């Protein structure tokens, strides 16, 4: 049932020994990612924790990658008009600017942007606008070393990964080395923002 699936997703951890959910060409990537970046936290476990910890009247926004699917499956809104998800076109880069506009519309309610690292890299310039205008938005950045959802779509069709994972180039000329470790909290240094990480 849904409650059992929610508990499974909410408690999921990952390491290099976790068996893949789908056995395809991408099966070893998640374990390698956990090893290279020293992380066992899954997106679903992070979403469960965020959902429990934020104010019950907070408004969340998202739009691209695997977050819309995971949030549709897992997110438990506690008040009306608190869930804003762009499903139609998976508009990468919308999450930060959308959160700024949303915060301007909802006033005192806390606003949380759920954004993947690929989308954040594409367009996070409105973070500076939020600072300039003294508009508080909360950015929850999910790092899956690039464009994980697009990578899953590529490899799920039997293709090799085509630069959708942020990996170092090896002597072969391919981007199949270890994963890059990007300090996304460091991106906001020099801006008067508060940085937290898990």
Protein language model regions, located:
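Active-site diphosphate/adenylate-binding microenvironment
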Residues: 21-103
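Charged, low-complexity, helix-prone segments enriched in Lys/Glu/Asp/Gln
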Residues: 13-36, 144-156
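General structural signal for secondary-structure boundaries
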Residues: 18-19, 42, 172, 198
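Terminal amphipathic helices with adjacent charged low-complexity linkers/tails
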Residues: 1-17
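Thiamine diphosphate
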Residues: 3-6, 69-70, 75-198
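Intrinsic-disorder/low-complexity coil detector
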Residues: 18-19, 54, 170, 191
């Amino acid at each position: 049932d849904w409650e059992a699936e929610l508990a499974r997703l909410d408690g999921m951890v990952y390491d290099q020994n976790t068996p893949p959910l789908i056995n395809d060409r991408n099966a070893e990537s998640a374990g390698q990612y956990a090893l290279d970046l020293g992380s066992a936290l899954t997106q679903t476990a992070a979403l469960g924790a965020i959902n429990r910890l934020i104010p019950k009247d907070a408004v969340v926004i998202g739009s691209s990658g695997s977050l819309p699917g995971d949030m549709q499956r897992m997110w438990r809104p506690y008040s009306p008009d608190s869930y804003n998800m762009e499903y139609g076109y998976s508009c990468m880069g919308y999450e930060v600017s959308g959160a700024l506009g949303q915060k301007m519309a909802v006033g005192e309610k806390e606003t949380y942007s759920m954004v993947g690292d690929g989308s954040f890299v594409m367009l996070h310039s409105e973070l500076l606008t939020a600072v300039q205008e003294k508009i508080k938005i909360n950015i929850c950045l999910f790092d899956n070393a690039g464009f994980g959802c697009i990578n899953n779509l590529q490899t799920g069709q039997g293709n090799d990964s085509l630069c959708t994972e942020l990996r170092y180039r090896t002597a072969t000329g391919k981007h199949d080395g270890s994963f890059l470790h990007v300090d996304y909290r460091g991106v906001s240094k020099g801006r008067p923002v508060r940085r937290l990480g898990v």
